[in-house]
From Swiss-Prot:
The protein, known as: D-galactonate dehydratase
Reaction(s) the record says it catalyses: D-galactonate = 2-dehydro-3-deoxy-D-galactonate + H2O
Source organism of this protein record: Escherichia coli O9:H4 (strain HS)
InterPro entries in UniProt: DgoD-like, Enolase-like_C_sf, Enolase-like_N, Enolase_C-like, Galactonate_deHydtase, Mandel_Rmase/mucon_lact_enz_CS, Mandelate_racemase_C, Mandelate_racemase_N_dom
Record pathway: Carbohydrate acid metabolism; D-galactonate degradation; D-glyceraldehyde 3-phosphate and pyruvate from D-galactonate: step 1/3
Function (record text): Catalyzes the dehydration of D-galactonate to 2-keto-3-deoxy-D-galactonate.
Length: 382
């Protein structure tokens, strides 16, 4: 079997799908994208495609190493996202050829279900509470919320109080009927993270995500030493080599590699194993589309330390398309009691509505994240 063609489709709301075709008619799908940089990743995919055309898709490990090592410069969000989507599609092909789901090819199930959680947008308490109520109606009881709006490098007590007030109102509205993590989104400087984490402790969040940017990872063990709240990070780390340094330094309790950013299934399975050796749990980052989610689920079901799975159903970014709009077998992604079950169809287990993908790709938006500024007009972290 040989790879004959690679096609990319930029899609709303901010996704990109990839299709790999073979000379035997077997097709694999992947989802390579960096939100806001889809065209750049697309170019990287087709650069890698120059080598991949004519290669045997079953040699996933060798193809991965070539894509990563054959270029003198390596790593980073663009290349690793391109590799990720290609890797997902190669696993999809392998599973279809062998008539088995990917998790079966990786040793079989380690669990029968995985807890799902949903991102809830909004910075005003009433908006967040309303969003939680809506999502509870479709079965969610675990959520992730903004931990704050933009904060200055050293900000005032009013800004801290505003962030804490939102969380306090949510806990008061729902008590312990729900669990929620708080996403600082890298918006918070190390000095302010120290203050804000302390103030939020009484509301017992499930975790605090990206308390500081990955570039400031040396602060993770320092922040962890001052709180009992688990710290989570990983969406802006792109290979096992990035995660190695964080695991060795300590401080992170929940690793969040993104299956569409961190080298795909092949690399993230290695990252999961590394985390397990350090007694660190896994909760793959996934505010993206259905192929990315499927890839995450296969890792969840073969990784002992996987504890939570993010997904984008109902997320406020989803303008123009919802999570399962391009999927034919929607029922396979249904949840029971807030849990996903294993996908059982061969490969990734996603049946893509290709005609709809082609149609929607004709007018795909170029999504960009907002540009925020502080009161003094300096750029703020979003």
């Amino acid at each position: 079997m040989k790879i004959t063609k690679i096609t990319t489709y930029r899609l709303p709301p901010r996704w990109m799908f990839l299709k790999i075709e073979t000379d035997e008619g077997v097709v694999g799908w992947g989802e390579p994208v960096i939100e806001g940089r889809a065209r750049t990743v697309e170019a990287a995919v087709h650069e890698l495609g120059d080598y991949l055309i004519g290669q045997d898709p079953s040699r996933i490990n060798d193809l991965w190493q070539v894509m990563y090592r054959a270029g003198f410069y390596r790593g980073g969000p663009i290349l690793m996202s391109a590799i990720a989507g290609i890797d997902q599609a190669l696993w999809d092909i392998k599973g279809k050829v062998l008539n088995a789901p990917v998790w079966q090819l990786m040793g079989g199930l380690v669990r029968d279900k995985i807890k799902a959680y949903s991102w809830v947008g909004g910075d005003r308490p009433a908006d967040v509470i309303g969003g939680i109520k809506t999502l509870r109606e479709i079965g969610f009881d675990t959520f992730k919320l903004n931990g704050c709006e933009e904060l200055g490098l050293i900000d005032n007590s009013r800004a801290v109080d505003a962030a804490v007030n939102t969380v306090a109102q949510i806990r008061e509205a729902f008590g312990n009927q729900i669990e929620f993590g708080l996403d600082f989104h890298g918006r918070v400087s190390a000095p302010m993270a120290k203050v804000l984490i302390k103030e939020l402790e009484p509301y017992r969040p499930l975790f605090i995500e990206e308390p500081v940017l990955a570039e400031q990872a040396e602060y993770y063990p320092k922040l962890a030493a001052q709180t009992h709240i688990p710290l989570a990070a990983g969406e802006r780390m792109f290979s096992r080599f990035d995660f190695k340094r964080v695991l060795e330094a300590g401080g992170i309790s929940i690793l969040q590699p993104d299956l569409s950013h961190a080298g795909g299934i092949t690399e993230c399975y290695k990252i999961a194993g590394m985390a397990e050796a350090y007694d660190v749990t896994l909760a793959p980052h996934c505010p993206l589309g259905p192929i990315a989610l499927a890839a995450c689920l296969h890792i969840d079901f073969v990784s002992y330390n996987a504890v939570l799975q993010e997904q984008s159903m109902g997320i406020h970014y989803n303008k123009g398309a919802e999570l399962l709009d391009f999927v034919k077998n929607k029922e396979d992604f249904s949840m029971v009691g807030g849990f996903f079950k294993p996908l059982t169809k061969p490969g990734l287990g996603v049946e893509i509505d290709e005609a709809k993908v082609i149609e929607f790709s004709k007018n795909a938006p170029d999504w960009r994240n907002p540009l925020w500024r502080h009161e003094d007009n300096s750029v703020a972290e979003w």
